[in-house]
Curated annotation (Swiss-Prot):
Keywords tagged on the record: Ribonucleoprotein, Ribosomal protein, RNA-binding, rRNA-binding
Gene: rplU
Name the record gives this protein: Large ribosomal subunit protein bL21
InterPro entries hit by this protein: bL21-like, bL21-like_sf, Ribosomal_bL21, Ribosomal_bL21_CS
Record organism: Mycolicibacterium smegmatis (strain ATCC 700084 / mc(2)155) (Mycobacterium smegmatis)
GO molecular function: rRNA binding; structural constituent of ribosome
Lineage, top ranks: Bacteria, Bacillati, Actinomycetota, Actinomycetes, Mycobacteriales
Homology family: Belongs to the bacterial ribosomal protein bL21 family.
S-S bonds: none
Length: 103
């Protein structure tokens, strides 16, 4: 069974293994830079590590590949019989990471 970790970034949790490519909310790092991600859980075969003392020894490193944008979402507010309507759009800024190792 392969080793994987649950990492927290941008208010979300992601399941990652070494070599995975993950899109996360924008990080303030340049492409090509190495970042360390905070770990919530590590599974290594039958061993599950979730204690804070043990997780302090674990590091998940990733390389920033690029910054990109997510798909456009459209928000439309409408109130019946008053003529009120409002349109708004949003594209989330994302960072593409490649996980280089779980140590």
């Amino acid at each position: 069974m392969a080793t994987y970790a649950i990492v927290k970034t941008g208010g979300k949790q992601y399941k990652v293994a070494a070599g995975d490519v993950v899109k996360v909310e924008k990080l303030d790092s340049e492409p090509g830079a190495s970042v360390s991600l905070p770990v919530a859980l590590v599974v290594d075969g039958a061993n599950v590590t979730s204690k804070a003392d043990d997780l302090a020894k674990v590091a998940v490193t990733a390389e920033v590949l690029e910054h990109t944008k997510g798909p456009k979402i459209r928000i439309h507010k409408f109130k019946n019989k008053t003529g009120y309507h409002k349109r708004q759009g949003h594209r989330q800024q994302l960072t593409v990471l490649k996980v280089t190792g779980i140590k």
